[in-house]
Amino acid sequence: MITAPASRLPVTVVTGFLGAGKSTLLRQLLLSSGLRLAVLVNEFGEVGIDGDLIRSCGFCPEEELDGRVVELANGCLCCTVQDEFLPVMQQLLQRADQLDGIVVETSGLALPLPLVQAFRWPEIRTRTRVTGVVTVVDGEALSNGSVVADPAALEAQRAADPSLDHLSDINSLFDDQLGAADLVLMSRADCLSEEAIQALQSRLSGQLRHGVSVLPMARGNVPAALLMGLDRPEEDEHHHDHDHDHDHHHHDHSHVAMDSVSLNWQGITSKAQLESLLPALIADHGLLRLKGRAWLPGKSHPLQIQAVGPRLECWFDSNSRLERPSSDGLELVALGLSLDASGVQEQLKGGLA
């Protein structure tokens, strides 16, 4: 659905080192999601490469490209927030009624947390909401003992950026990217054995916040619902004709296949009760995404609920056009891998009873 001008536009931040697979992931997301997304690409050194890869994939009509793909090539995004990032975001938000969301692809050197914190600036915090930070790691490089496939190229990228004001070593940057993640995607998983994938998942999980999952990925194939805090639009809304169906159908052992569980509760709940209950539900069952709404006593607007990994956000949606039902209640959809549906339902009901 097209986002109402007064509502907050969902933002997904994608981070990871040079060559990890961020642009491949974005191309697949843009081609397969059916959403009207704007992309902010931060790159330097090999100026324009990532932006050109995204522009050339045919995800939108050519006349819309300048308004849908914005490149920042003047340095590390987290170091140029005030001078570069905020003006571009304000420019994109002038077109918020034409967009379903924004994806920010950081350079390999950006610290994710300063960027996320920038969305709290008064100029944009009432117009956007960060639905998740997705960190892409190179599974093949990690299995070979390095956090990046080409350390020399990454060091050259560091040397080419005069605006860089943090001197963290590569391993520390990797730790920062993992520490900020709500979801970690392991690229090039099709080059690894199942045993190697499991070993890397176990190794990385020790560096992550509780509840953050590590998923294998090949050629950027990940369900859009996992990355964007949005509902897929109806087919008759801003549908585009594209001749790239061949890009949509890669299937192999590392393609993410998710289970979904619908959760419903009729009765009285409160925002505080849900904010206390849902983080444990997410962590205990390894939920990757949780979304839905609740109608609460005395409230005319629904409480919208969105979570990516452990990042949970609940807010009353004054822009909702949904008609209020006659009774209070909760409607949720949980996404995850090999979900214990009955266990998820029982824990939710036990916490609400």
Question: What are these regions, as identified by a protein language model?
Answer:
Residues 2, 151-321, 325-330, 339-342, ...:
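C-terminal accessory "lid"/substrate-recognition subdomains
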Residues 2-15, 20-171:
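Nucleotide-state-sensitive switch-loop elements of NTP-binding domains
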Residues 41, 137, 307-309, 336:
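Flexible glycine-/small-residue-rich
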Residues 43, 139, 188-189, 338:
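Residue-level signal for short, function-critical loop segments
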Residues 43, 133, 214, 274, ...:
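A residue-level signal for conserved active-site and pocket-lining positions in enzyme catalytic cores
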Residues 105, 330-337:
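Short, well-ordered beta-strand elements
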